Structure formats: C-alpha cells, structure tokens
C-alpha cells in the first residue's frame, strides 16, 4: 500500500505544466547508466555503440532489401526503426563525448556540481527517446495483435520482420531499464503527436491515390480510409494504448529507481562492512 501511495504522489507531482518541457539540472544522468557507480564506465560506452551499430546495420539492410521504389518510407514500422537508429546513434556519440571529455563535456558539468542546464542537444535526444520508446511498443503491439497474418501481402523477409516488429520493443525496454535520466508522464504527448502526424500522412497519401508495393490503396488494412469509421476507431485505440503504456513505463521507472537505491545502500562500503 505504501508503494502505491508513493506512486500516486509521484504521479500527481508530474502533472505540472513545466513538465511538458525538457529542463533538468542533473544532466550527468543522460550520459551514464542507472547502474554504474563511477562517472565513466567503459562497459556502458561499449553497450551504447553495440546498440547503435546493431540498429544502424539492420536499418541499412531493410532499406536495401525493402526499398520498393520508396514505398519503404510509408510504413510506421520503418519510421519507428529509423527513429530507434537515430536515437541510439545520438546516445552513443553523447556518451563518447562524456567518456573522453570531448569539448570539456564532463568537466563543465562537474564544475557546476552536476547542476548544469540541459543543453539543446540533450533536449532533442530526450524528445526523440520519448517518441522512440512509445512508438516501438505501439508498433509491436499493433503488428502482432492486428496485422500479423492479416495483411494482403506475403511476408518476404520473416527474420527482418521479427527484428523490426518484435526485437525493437524488447531492445528499447532493455535500454529503458539501463538509462538513468527520468521519464515524465506529460511527455506522452510527443508520442501522441507523432501518431497524429502519421494518421494525417496516411489520409493525405490515400487522397493522392497512393498505394503500397502490392497496389493496395492503403498503408495498413486498419487504416484504409475507404472505411473512415474503422480508421477513427484505430486512431482512438492507439491514443489509449499510448496512455496505458506510458503510465506503465512511469511505474517501471519508479521501480527501477527504487531497486537502484536499495542496491546502492546494500553495496555501499558501510553496509558491506556490516555484513
């Protein structure tokens, strides 16, 4: 019960207009893992580059084998995986700059007592990460529940499909458990804004006579604008799903912080000496 009460208090504190923004004075958390003790960590640096290069390699392969005269870019799956790639590359570069103190990235933050203002680059990264995380979960859920085996087209690359529709969300969830910077409830609006943008894109694409690579006059069957009622149901459903996932992620973020504090106490020099 105490845990639930603490969650509700934290949730209510999040509902402030300022939390729509990206101001955060503990900027060192954007450069480190939730679980590392020191300011820099070589394992975390390697982790960031392995993640980034994996996403980049898969995305390049997807473009090569699925380009289809540009039809590759009409799908939300490929938007989402592209965002994953960009976000992971930015994170890898930022952690590298912190690790090697490029342009005094780490020194300036340490001199400020870890109270430096959030730079524009970090704000962009935070904004992208929010959209990437929510979009990955939505893509996996919608594909496996509503689209898999129900689309009027053959599955030509099953291995790629598993990576882009399944491993994407698994890897983003793993990364979410690793990173140290916070998740804000009100940042769910950025995932919603991307959903609105994609819905408008599919509508405009339909009105312009656009088709998929097999000649179907829709991007996805559940977004066939010849049946606008179904499209609106899909639209509302996606919004509700984003909200549910974001609240669950906020709870997971709080649990992660709680476990981190517990382990920090257990493995502190004083605690170890008492064992």
From Swiss-Prot:
InterPro entries (alphabetical): Rost
Transmembrane segments: 45-65, 72-92, 127-147, 162-182, 185-205, 232-252
Gene deletion effect: Flies exhibit diminished fusion of embryonic myoblasts to syncytial myotubes.
Source superkingdom: Eukaryota
Subcellular location: Membrane
Membrane topology value: Multi-pass membrane protein
Primary location class: membrane
Tissue expr: Expressed in cells of the somatic mesoderm, most notably the muscle founder cells, between embryonic stages 12 and 14, in growing muscle fibers in dorsal, lateral and ventral positions. At stage 16 strongest expression is in some ventral muscles and muscle 8. At stages 16/17 expression is restricted to some cells of the CNS, the brain and the gonads.
GO biological process: myoblast fusion
Pfam families membership: Rost
Keyword annotations of the record: Developmental protein, Membrane, Muscle protein, Transmembrane, Transmembrane helix
GO cellular component, one term: membrane
Function: May have a central role in the fusion process during myogenesis, within the somatic mesoderm.
Protein name per the record: Protein rolling stone
Protein species of origin: Drosophila melanogaster (Fruit fly)
